[in-house]
């Protein structure tokens, strides 16, 4: 009994000493680990600042291994992988972050946004769209919608693009009316290509309502009406571009000529073209004027004179080539503007 008591008295101090020594060793190891993680982290930053991305990645991997619970290191590493085009590794890093149960709500949103960027950069648009949808209702919602809009435009998914553009407008972003009209125009072209001219015309009317000042819906509608044999309606639609002074009006000049000739509206169309040309000289409008004036008896002489006048107002190689067709270069008063145009071409 006395012997047992002696051993107990001897063992208690020894056990206490061993416990104290073990705790000191654990504390020392913890301090070493904590020093190693920041050291590796700052080493990675140094490499990054010196544009040594390979070494920076190695340093960040070391830091993550030493402190796997540090989310900032994961974000830094994932972003580095994405910048280098190593999208699969970036995806793995950000998916690992999302799998952690202790991640804060803010960091979870950041990781989801980073993962969506990985998919976009990798060209995995379906997975990117799914990842971006999960950001609805977060602080990244606006950015995510813009990214989805870019995806839909890239993949020509016009109804979805229009839906997202409407959401962006409702959330206080800038007006997307012109882009939404463009989506309707693209849908109209697809319908027309499949033989649904009526449906295409309806979409173009909707586009005109969406963006009254956008020139493309009227231009496409006028061309559609012309191709459908509705020359008078086409003439009225295309004339609106010139009456409004649209900068895109010259693009409709050739179609207006065809519509006016088919609808027997040459005098009114010619007057409209001449008024527009007087305000904004343009070779496309001049070509249209010449085309409508060619019915006159002295058409050839008038054509040459028109292009000479245009060369004096707006020297260009294209106008000079129009005049040169069958022209006599002998006269000095005509040679000078032609020469000037050729020199400036």
Which residues fall in each region the model found?
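Start-of-helix register in tetratricopeptide repeats
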Residues: 38, 72, 106-110, 143, ...
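Short coil turns that delineate tetratricopeptide repeat
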Residues: 68, 102, 106, 139-140, ...
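Residue at a conserved register position within TPR or TPR-like alpha-solenoid repeats
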Residues: 47, 81, 119, 152, ...
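Alpha-helical repeat scaffolds
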Residues: 91-99, 125-136, 159-171, 196-207, ...
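Alpha-helical segment of the N-proximal tetratricopeptide repeat
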Residues: 33-69, 82-86, 121, 186-194
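Structural motif corresponding to the intra-repeat A-B loop/turn of tetratricopeptide repeats
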Residues: 50, 84, 122, 155, ...
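Structural register within alpha-helical repeat arrays
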Residues: 43, 77, 115, 148, ...
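Long, contiguous interaction/recruitment modules in multidomain scaffold/adaptor proteins
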Residues: 1-35, 130-133, 137, 142-150, ...
């Amino acid at each position: 009994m006395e012997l047992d008591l002696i051993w107990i008295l001897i063992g208690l101090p020894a056990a206490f000493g061993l416990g104290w020594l073990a705790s000191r060793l654990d504390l020392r190891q913890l301090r070493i680990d904590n020093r190693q993680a920041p050291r590796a982290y700052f080493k990675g930053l140094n490499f990054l600042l010196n544009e040594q991305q390979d070494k920076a990645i190695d340093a960040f991997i070391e830091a993550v291994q030493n402190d796997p619970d540090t989310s900032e290191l994961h974000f830094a590493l994932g972003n580095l992988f994405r910048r280098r085009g190593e999208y699969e590794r970036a995806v793995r890093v950000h998916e690992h972050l999302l799998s952690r149960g202790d991640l804060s709500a803010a960091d979870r949103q950041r990781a989801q946004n980073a993962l969506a960027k990985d998919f976009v950069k990798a060209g995995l648009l379906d997975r990117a769209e799914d990842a971006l949808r999960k950001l609805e209702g977060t602080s990244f919602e606006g950015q995510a919608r813009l990214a989805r809009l870019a995806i839909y435009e890239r993949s020509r998914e016009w109804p979805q693009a229009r839906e997202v553009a409407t959401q962006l407008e409702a959330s206080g972003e800038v007006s997307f009316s012109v882009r939404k009209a463009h989506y309707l125009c693209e849908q109209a072209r697809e319908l027309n290509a499949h033989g649904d001219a009526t449906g295409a015309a309806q979409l173009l009317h909707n586009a005109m309502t969406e963006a009254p000042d956008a020139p493309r819906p009227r231009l496409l509608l006028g061309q559609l009406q012309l191709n459908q044999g509705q020359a008078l309606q086409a003439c009225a639609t295309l004339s609106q571009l010139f009456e409004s002074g649209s900068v895109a009006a010259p693009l409709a000049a050739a179609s207006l000529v065809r519509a006016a000739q088919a609808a027997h509206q040459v005098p009114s169309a010619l007057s409209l073209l001449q008024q527009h040309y007087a305000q904004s000289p343009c070779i496309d409008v001049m070509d249209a004027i010449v085309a409508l004036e060619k019915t006159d008896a002295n058409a050839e002489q008038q054509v040459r004179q028109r292009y000479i006048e245009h060369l004096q107002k707006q020297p260009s190689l294209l106008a000079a080539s129009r005049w040169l067709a069958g022209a006599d270069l002998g006269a000095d008063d005509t040679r000078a503007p032609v020469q000037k145009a050729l020199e400036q071409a």
